[in-house]
Swiss-Prot record:
Protein's job: Channel that opens in response to stretch forces in the membrane lipid bilayer. May participate in the regulation of osmotic pressure changes within the cell.
Keywords annotated in UniProt: Cell inner membrane, Cell membrane, Ion channel, Ion transport, Membrane, Transmembrane, Transmembrane helix, Transport
Topology of the protein relative to the lipid bilayer: Multi-pass membrane protein
Gene behind this protein: mscL
Full protein name: Large-conductance mechanosensitive channel
Length: 137
């Protein structure tokens, strides 16, 4: 088997395709969460704290000199990234929890014993008759 055919077999496996779809959806979901945190959650929190825009919070370590930019510690962006992570982690947790609950419900669902077919009933009757004949003196 050549390298190209091995790669083709690997690339079209269900797990690889599923993983690629998951990564693409995850990237899009990350953008949605970042927008949600930056545009919906952080402004009211900043307003409650005193009109502070968290993304602008920073400590200047060294002022700008000439053409060299200032060296800053942008902790506001870090706070926003932490909130992004917490929201994404919580959403994933809730999704996994829901999937696990569905799996448990499937496992708990009682399975009824199969109804014997006519042939199985007939074979059972024949078995019982043979046992009865063998037990006679």
């Amino acid at each position: 088997m050549g390298v190209l055919s091995e790669f083709k077999a690997f690339a079209v496996k269900g797990n690889v395709v599923d993983m690629a779809v998951g990564i693409i959806i995850g990237a899009a979901f990350g953008k949605i969460v970042s927008s949600f945190v930056g545009d919906v959650i952080m402004p009211p929190i900043g307003l409650l704290i005193g009109g502070v825009d968290f993304s602008d919070l920073a400590i200047t370590l060294k002022a700008a000199e000439g053409s060299a930019p200032a060296v800053v510690l942008a902790y506001g962006k870090f706070i926003q990234s932490v909130l992004d992570f917490v929201i994404v982690a919580f959403a994933i947790f809730m999704g996994v929890k829901a999937i696990n609950r569905l799996k448990r419900e499937e496992a708990v669902a009682p399975t009824l014993p199969p109804v014997p077919t006519k042939e199985e009933e007939l074979l059972g009757e024949i078995r019982d008759l043979l046992k009865a004949q063998n037990n006679r003196p």
